Amino acid sequence: MNKGNSLEKNRRLIPSNQEMDKAIYALRDVAIETPLVEIPELAERLQLNSLHLKLESMQRTGSFKFRGAYWRCMQLSQKERHRGVVAFSSGNFAQALPVAAAFIGTSAKIVMPIDAPAIKRLRAESFGADVILTKHGKKGREVVAAQMAQKIAKKENRALLHPFDDVHMIAGNSSTAIEIIETLNVKNHPLPHHVFCCAGGGGLISGIAMGFARYSPNTKVVPVEPEGFDSTRQSLNCGKATTLKLSNNSICDALQALRPGDAPFACLSSIKMGIPTIVVDKQVRAAMALAYDLRRIMLEPSGAAPLAALIKHGDEMKGKDIIIIASGANIQPEDFVRYIKEGVPE
């Protein structure tokens, strides 16, 4: 592929300003404008100028995923809506998609890894999804689930929706960044120097990054990944989307994509990002315990990973205005209790 064709392909993978505006306008009527909570005592402890948590954990279905799912469903034709949709998901998109689908009067079938958290499967079913479980063995859990979703789409003539590698998903997720900027502007508060955001397949962080690149270009969005699943970091470092070998496990079940999506990577590589960082499970458990201790905020591990990254890099952030994207809260209560007990310093 020559350079001109490559640039044209990348443009098709990056949401336009016009589409982001349409998505933001549409979502105002259906999405929750989630709280932006200031944590001055932790800011003082870390010697930051300010610290806010954007609680996407309080979005419909308990994570940011509803934003992209709804806007993607809005793009379906009437014929596609009649036939229904299918997608693979490790859990959070599995819950968001049936709710988004119901808004437009269609049905959702979800393929999930058999080891996805039970609460995510049960909640997906309670929201109206028809859930199919897959065993993955030594293969990547999302690879196997994606293959099954493709087979179902072909067999049942359903629209196949990708949970993160989709320009419309990214446009929907950009609304999170716009809400943050609007809230800070109303408060006459400085825009952030850094935004810490988890990176799995890249659907959330690419939307966040595109929103800030447009309205706060000096803000650096920092990708946060669990150890062994740093595909975004490796991809940005080498300049192309890179597939990892499965070599690790993590309590961050929503951040186990072995490769960033083409559309998210096109977005992230088109702007200047913050330096990607890696967190380990011990740091994530400590961040979960800290969020609960400070504000009784309940986060799933993936949602707490950005806070863990801030704690890890606190010395580098002194004097800065920081935003943490708390992306989700879908976790078994008994697992949450166990993790925060393990995360409390001895």
Residue spans for each PLM region:
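PLP-dependent amino-acid enzyme catalytic core
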Residues: M1-E346
